[in-house]
């Protein structure tokens, strides 16, 4: 027997997830949804936020690999001195 998923499928891209999340937030802020639908929207929004965070972390790790030894710790004091 297959397990039935109670949540919608994950989006195919970060941009798609963000667009859906923006729509959910707008509907919730506008007060268009009844209580049960608001809870479902909140749950879906939470899933989308987790998906987006995972995508951002994945891309961040890819950038770190690509930059390799070029990455250096940021020194705020030096940045301020350079601006002066």
Curated annotation (Swiss-Prot):
Keyword Hydrolase appears in the UniProt entry: yes
Transferase in keyword set: no
EC numbers for this chain: 3.1.11.6
Main localisation: cytoplasm
Example of a GO cellular component annotation carried by this entry: exodeoxyribonuclease VII complex
Domain of life: Bacteria
Sample GO molecular function, one term: exodeoxyribonuclease VII activity
A Pfam cross-reference name: Exonuc_VII_S
InterPro entries documented for this protein: Exonuc_VII_S (IPR003761), Exonuc_VII_ssu_sf (IPR037004)
Subunit note: Heterooligomer composed of large and small subunits.
Family: Belongs to the XseB family.
Function noted in UniProt: Bidirectionally degrades single-stranded DNA into large acid-insoluble oligonucleotides, which are then degraded further into small acid-soluble oligonucleotides.
This protein's name: Exodeoxyribonuclease 7 small subunit
Natural source organism: Janthinobacterium sp. (strain Marseille) (Minibacterium massiliensis)
């Amino acid at each position: 027997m297959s397990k039935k998923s109670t949540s919608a499928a994950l989006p195919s891209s970060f941009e798609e997830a963000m667009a859906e999340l923006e729509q959910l937030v707008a509907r919730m802020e506008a007060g268009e949804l009844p209580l049960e639908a608001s809870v479902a929207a909140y749950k879906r929004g939470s899933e989308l936020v987790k998906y987006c965070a995972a995508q951002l972390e994945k891309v961040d790790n890819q950038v770190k690999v690509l930059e390799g030894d070029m990455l250096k710790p940021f020194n705020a004091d030096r940045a301020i001195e350079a601006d002066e």
